[in-house]
Amino acid sequence: AWSLKYKDCDPPIWLLNYLFDRYEHNIEQKLWIAWIYGTTYHLPTAWIIWNEFPDFELVGLERLKQWNNDNYKRLRYQTDTKYNKGYLPQQFESYKEWIANKPQLDKFAELKTFDNVWNSVIKNLYKFGRYSTWFYLQTLHECVGLDLQPSTLKLEDYGGSKSHRNGLCYAL
């Protein structure tokens, strides 16, 4: 009923928009939280990580490793990202390298289009496969406000997940 009423099959999107508005996050904070959410696909865990490490540019890798190890058993990841659990430091390292010591927004301005961002994320961000990349880009579009419109639903991708095709068939 929630999804039909709000025309959203992913309630965390609504909640992220509420939190961004309520706490008046700036664009860099939104981008950082969107990436954390992309690694976990579990908004409570993403929010906890963000509260511990609120500034992307100030995250110390050794502290992140220690914190991740200390909190491993308590952190929850969504089923689709369960194999990311425990790899937050490595994922962060790849994200930091990808951003390349500049504002996060500059990276997206440089890449410009959905397809360019998609290809770059898949290639450069550790443990971001098709599914993680899709909902990460969805979050960037729907919550952060980046103009990332997919050029395809990836229905021709027979080598990976079938859930997006099955879901579309069910919806039709």
Identify the meaning behind each predicted range.
Residues 1-88, 142:
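Structure-specific DNA junction-binding interface
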Residues 34-42, 121, 125, 140-141, ...:
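Generic structural signal for hydrophobic core residues of well-folded globular domains
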Residues 4-14, 110-117, 158-161:
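Short acidic alpha-helix initiation/capping motifs at coil-to-helix transition points
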Residues 76-126:
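Helix-hairpin-helix/helix-loop-helix acidic hairpins
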Residues 138-172:
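Accessory, usually C-terminal, subdomains that scaffold auxiliary metal cofactors
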